[in-house]
């Protein structure tokens, strides 16, 4: 009997193959006391495990094939950075000595503490980094107990092998190039987890976040991985198999056609130019940006320069990163978002003004621009680095989590101070356009006042939807209430877009809605002309744009915006995408 499981679509595509179960699970953690005179030996054992883990990761990074996606090396580098952080390399030793316990148990106590801290982070992407931390912990643990860190792919794998695992690390995926891996599914992972990102980057059909797939699948069982809709079908019947074989052929044909429009300008059927930008978090992502023909960078997440370290990154260190990216863009625009962190994410080097106060809801506490304003030295240091990078090409600076015009005014004062400091030092710096992230309802409602002070706004739909609907999409019990097509969300977006257009100020969306083709035509009809997304979604969105007529879509959008019922709005959006005009977009 067939079983259908629903998860998160990661790598797009459809695959039919034989399941190969990766049985590596959660390791049993021993717990025992250590005699005081043996504590030094236990510390040495832990240090040796750290060294062995570092050697493994460095060897893996050196073994990455040249044609592998840049994200693979970036994630292994992230694991190395996490390994060297004191929270994993030194603090377990403090626990070991204080409680006189074995290294494995001390490591577990510390990882449980860190996992709870990650769970309290509001930002989806940063919260998902918990899995990276846990994978590093697993490597350390395995080296402590003498277990292998490699997944078992022994035996003769079939040409259509589908890996079934609890989770896959970046290091695991290095093996994909050497093995017959058609697709993979995991029980763990969310939309912004490294597993999802690597699935997209490796261009392998994949579905993650299935929870119990491994318990329901037997070795070599036939499975269908639908990486388009996030569906796994176990033991399908012949009718379903034939239908998915047809869908797989259609998808491959569709993909070949999409590759033909990489260098085509994103212009609608009625001649409206649309700007398609990429969201990135490292210099390594520039390759993907160029590969998919992005017009520039709509969001550079700068906070990764600040994570997992004991001191704030220096101005010169930040300048080198920003300037390097600006130069690689060769004249294309980049929007750098100033650091979007909370005290719950990395409190070790924050000043007294931002000491954690035990807030039960860090998302509503000292986060985003509030933290920047509480740490003016950090804020001005970053802005000086961005200003200096702007001497090498067009740069926009964007402030996160703005709630009011008073915050914007304070930011402008700090910007003026940063510019004056550079002038006094005789440093060369360039002009920057200034903008704000609109991701808080208060900012959305007062966007007109905010736009009087800045050049552009970018809508962070991920957080805006969560705040508007009071729902945490990372919580499985309420995630179904996260509805981008909810009338309250659509009316809020329309207000922001219409206000910015009327004031002739720039407006974009940089949340997931920008890369979701379900909403492309609706957003065009609402007047959006700048989309910023994961580079992997650019061609699919461009294809819809090329076949869209904005004049027709404006009428359709107006009808949808008059809806008051979420279900009716969703139905009308589906009708919009299934209309004759939408059908003409099919490649």
Q: Where would I find each of the regions flagged by the language model?
A:
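Non-catalytic, soluble scaffold/interaction modules
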Residues: 1-328, 334-341, 375, 382-383, ...
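Conserved alpha/beta-domain cores
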Residues: 255-587
């Amino acid at each position: 009997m067939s079983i259908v499981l629903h998860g998160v679509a990661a790598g797009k595509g459809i695959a039919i193959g034989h399941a190969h179960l990766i049985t590596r699970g959660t390791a049993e953690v021993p717990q025992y006391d250590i005699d005081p005179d043996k504590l030094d030996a236990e510390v040495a054992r832990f240090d040796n495990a750290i060294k062995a883990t570092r050697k493994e990761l460095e060897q893996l990074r050196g073994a990455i094939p040249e044609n592998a996606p840049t994200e693979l090396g970036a994630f292994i580098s992230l694991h190395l950075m996490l390994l060297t952080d004191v929270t994993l390399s030194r603090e377990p030793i403090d626990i070991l000595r204080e409680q006189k316990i074995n290294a494995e148990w001390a490591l577990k106590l510390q990882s449980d503490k860190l996992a709870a801290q990650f769970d309290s982070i509001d930002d989806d992407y940063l919260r998902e980094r918990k899995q990276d931390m846990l994978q590093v912990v697993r490597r350390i643990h395995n080296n402590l107990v003498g277990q292998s860190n490699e997944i078992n792919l022994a035996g003769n794998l079939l040409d259509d092998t589908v890996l079934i695992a609890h989770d896959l690390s970046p290091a695991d995926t290095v093996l994909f190039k050497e093995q017959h891996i058609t697709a993979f599914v995991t029980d763990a992972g969310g939309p912004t987890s490294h597993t999802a990102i690597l699935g997209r980057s490796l261009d392998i059909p994949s579905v993650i976040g299935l929870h119990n797939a491994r318990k329901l699948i037997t070795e070599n069982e036939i499975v269908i991985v639908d990486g388009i809709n996030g569906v796994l079908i176990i033991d399908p019947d012949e009718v379903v198999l034939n239908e998915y074989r047809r869908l797989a052929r259609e998808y491959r044909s569709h993909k070949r056609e999409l590759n033909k429009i990489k260098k085509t300008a994103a212009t609608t059927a009625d001649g409206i130019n649309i700007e398609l930008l990429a969201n990135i978090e490292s210099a390594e992502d520039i390759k993907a940006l160029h590969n998919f023909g992005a017009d520039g960078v709509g969001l550079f997440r700068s906070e990764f320069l600040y994570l997992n370290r004991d001191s704030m990154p220096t101005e010169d260190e930040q300048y080198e990163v920003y300037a390097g990216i600006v130069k690689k863009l060769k004249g294309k625009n980049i929007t750098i978002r100033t650091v979007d962190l909370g005290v719950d994410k990395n409190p070790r080097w924050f000043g007294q003004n931002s000491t954690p106060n035990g807030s039960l809801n860090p998302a509503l506490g000292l986060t985003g621009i509030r933290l920047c304003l509480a740490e003016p030295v950090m804020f001005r240091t970053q802005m000086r680095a961005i200003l200096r990078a702007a001497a090498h090409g067009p740069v926009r600076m964007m402030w996160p989590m703005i709630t009011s015009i008073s915050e914007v005014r304070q930011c402008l004062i700090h910007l003026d101070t940063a510019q004056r400091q550079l002038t006094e030092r005789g440093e060369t710096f360039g002009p920057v356009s200034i903008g704000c992230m609109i991701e808080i309802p208060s900012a959305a409602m007062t966007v007109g006042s905010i736009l009087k002070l800045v050049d552009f706004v970018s809508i962070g739909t991920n957080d805006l939807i969560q705040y508007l609907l009071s729902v945490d999409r990372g919580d499985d019990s309420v995630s179904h209430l996260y509805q981008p097509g909810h009338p309250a969300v659509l009316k809020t977006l329309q207000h922001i877009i219409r206000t910015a257009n009327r004031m002739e100020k720039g407006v974009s969306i940089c949340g997931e809605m920008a890369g979701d083709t379900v909403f492309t035509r609706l957003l065009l009809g609402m007047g959006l002309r700048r989309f910023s997304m994961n580079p992997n979604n650019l061609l699919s969105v461009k294809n819809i744009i090329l076949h869209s007529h904005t004049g027709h879509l404006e009428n359709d959008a107006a009808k949808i915006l008059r809806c008051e019922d979420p279900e009716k709005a969703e139905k009308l959006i589906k009708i919009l995408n299934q209309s004759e005009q939408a059908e003409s977009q099919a490649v």
